[in-house]
């Protein structure tokens, strides 16, 4: 077999393969003999069919099978012979039967060979944040709000109060589907209703009626209502103000704090959890910034096959999240056509490029996972659980789970390696702003 290779692009190679006709003939004759031993043809006993009859009846199909098998086998032999780091399946083209050889072309995508630019040209913003006493107080207040109750008031409805009311909507004097409800509960300021609706209720008292004018957003999900002006008749039945629980023995007990330890122990525990959250948030932020800079500075071409695989992975991940959120029944009714390739393509391309670049950085720097950092990472994560020892043992005994942590730590080591040479600018942010940024990153 003869093979020549030419570069089609940075990530594709064209193989010109020539297979001697003798190889095809040998395999054809051998398969013809095997077929003659098993084929059943009327008028002949099994295994006694003459070779010329088998050749006449099955020769063409057997020959095509042999050719297909030889093309398949020889293209992979050629890839191995030429030491090509192939990704995805080869594409067979221009098959030609010559007198002395079977000749064909095969195009195959290859893993990118890249050179990473020096890190000293990268600019990375590294954010810093400190937990202040006011942040801890706000967090404890949030814990109280999560367990708040409601107390009826005769006063006016204000933001953060809960209102029970009836409403009846109309457009040009005509009622519309879904525009009415009774005993509807709404926390003012929650943003559950269309713009202007909640503002119209603020200031009302129990027993009052009012008609408010609002306009449905242009992008409202119900197309028959989008952009239209509507009137809602509001009848307030009850106004309730939030009542926070006292920070007493019962409240402290919820968080594993005794009455003797008191509020200071709760504050210390809350601060510890917040500091862990900040560490993780800052680590993720600088990792994102460093990797963004790395990808932006290194324009590389990646194989479509790798991008397609990453698209499939991200799509499957989204389906799994949908299944976890809505259960098996919801997953069965889920239409995957709602998740076209284009939805994931941009992120998938970035992910593949980043993976190639990070792998190259690891190889060039000869980085290996720091097991001490892995243990420290697990210890830090386990400290948020009721029984840290159990969590530590879990990761110690589950190789697959530990491997996932090792991958995260190895990425952190790559980031440290980049930051050691990059132009890093530190920027202090508040705890609140850091949380908002984390939430925005999770949302997309």
Curated annotation (Swiss-Prot):
GO cellular component assignments: cytoplasm
Q: What's the catalysed reaction?
A: [protein]-peptidylproline (omega=180) = [protein]-peptidylproline (omega=0)
> Keywords assigned by UniProt?
Cell cycle, Cell division, Chaperone, Cytoplasm, Isomerase, Rotamase
Name where it's found.
Cytoplasm
Residue ranges of the PPIase FKBP-type domain?
160-245
Main localisation = cytoplasm
Entry's EC annotation: 5.2.1.8
Q: Which GO terms describe its molecular function?
A: peptidyl-prolyl cis-trans isomerase activity; protein folding chaperone; ribosome binding
Q: Name one GO biological process term.
A: chaperone-mediated protein folding
Which InterPro entries does this UniProt record tie to the protein? PPIase_dom_sf, PPIase_FKBP_dom, Trig_fac, Trigger_fac_C, Trigger_fac_C_sf, Trigger_fac_ribosome-bd_bac, Trigger_fac_ribosome-bd_sf, Trigger_fact/SurA_dom_sf
Which top EC class is named for this enzyme in its record? isomerase
Top-rank taxon: Bacteria
Q: Which Gene3D superfamilies match?
A: 3.10.50.40, Trigger factor ribosome-binding domain (3.30.70.1050), Trigger factor, C-terminal domain (1.10.3120.10)
What does the entry note on its domains?
Consists of 3 domains; the N-terminus binds the ribosome, the middle domain has PPIase activity, while the C-terminus has intrinsic chaperone activity on its own.
The task this protein performs is described as: Involved in protein export. Acts as a chaperone by maintaining the newly synthesized protein in an open conformation. Functions as a peptidyl-prolyl cis-trans isomerase.
What PANTHER family would the database entry show? TRIGGER FACTOR CHAPERONE AND PEPTIDYL-PROLYL CIS/TRANS ISOMERASE, TRIGGER FACTOR-LIKE PROTEIN TIG, CHLOROPLASTIC
- NCBIfam families per record: tig
Q: Which family does it belong to?
A: Belongs to the FKBP-type PPIase family. Tig subfamily.
Q: What is this protein called?
A: Trigger factor
């Amino acid at each position: 077999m003869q093979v020549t290779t030419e570069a089609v692009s940075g990530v594709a190679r064209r193989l010109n393969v020539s297979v001697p006709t003798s190889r095809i003939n040998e395999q054809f004759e051998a398969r013809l003999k095997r077929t003659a031993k098993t084929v059943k043809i009327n008028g002949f006993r099994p295994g006694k069919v003459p070779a010329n009859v088998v050749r006449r009846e099955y020769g063409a199909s057997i020959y095509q099978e042999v050719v297909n098998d030889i093309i398949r086998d020889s293209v992979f032999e050629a890839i191995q012979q030429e030491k090509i780091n192939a990704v995805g399946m080869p594409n067979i083209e221009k098959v030609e039967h010559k007198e002395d050889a079977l000749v064909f072309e095969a195009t195959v995508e290859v893993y990118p060979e890249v050179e990473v630019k020096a890190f000293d040209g990268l600019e990375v913003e590294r954010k810093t944040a400190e937990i202040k006493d006011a942040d801890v107080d706000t967090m404890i207040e949030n814990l109280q709000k999560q367990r708040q109750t409601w107390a009826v008031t005769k006063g006016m409805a204000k933001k953060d109060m809960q209102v029970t009311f009836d409403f009846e909507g109309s457009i040009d004097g005509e009622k519309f589907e879904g525009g009415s409800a009774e005993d509807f509960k709404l926390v003012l300021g929650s943003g559950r209703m269309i713009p202007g609706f909640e503002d119209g209720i603020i200031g009302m008292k129990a027993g009052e009626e009012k008609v408010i004018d609002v306009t449905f957003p242009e992008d409202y999900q119900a197309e028959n209502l989008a952009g239209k002006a509507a009137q809602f008749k509001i009848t307030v039945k009850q106004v309730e103000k939030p009542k926070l629980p006292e920070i007493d023995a019962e409240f402290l007990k919820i968080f594993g704090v005794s009455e003797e330890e008191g509020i200071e122990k709760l504050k210390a525990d809350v601060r510890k959890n917040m500091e862990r959250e900040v560490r993780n948030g800052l680590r993720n932020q600088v990792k994102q910034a460093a990797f963004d800079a790395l990808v932006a500075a290194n324009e590389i071409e990646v194989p479509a096959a790798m991008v397609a695989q990453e698209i499939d992975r991200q799509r499957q991940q989204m389906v799994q999240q949908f299944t976890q959120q809505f259960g098996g029944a919801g997953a069965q009714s889920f239409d995957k056509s709602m998740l076209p390739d284009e939805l994931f393509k941009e992120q998938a391309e970035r992910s593949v490029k980043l993976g190639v670049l990070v792998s190259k950085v690891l190889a060039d720097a000869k980085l290996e996972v720091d097991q001490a950092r892995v243990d420290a990472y697990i210890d830090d994560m386990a400290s948020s659980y009721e029984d840290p020892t159990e969590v530590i043992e879990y990761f110690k005994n589950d190789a697959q789970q530990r491997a996932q942590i090792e991958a995260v730590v190895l990425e952190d080591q790559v980031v440290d390696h980049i930051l050691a040479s990059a132009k890093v600018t530190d920027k202090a942010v508040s705890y609140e702003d850091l949380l908002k940024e984390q939430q925005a990153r999770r949302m997309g």
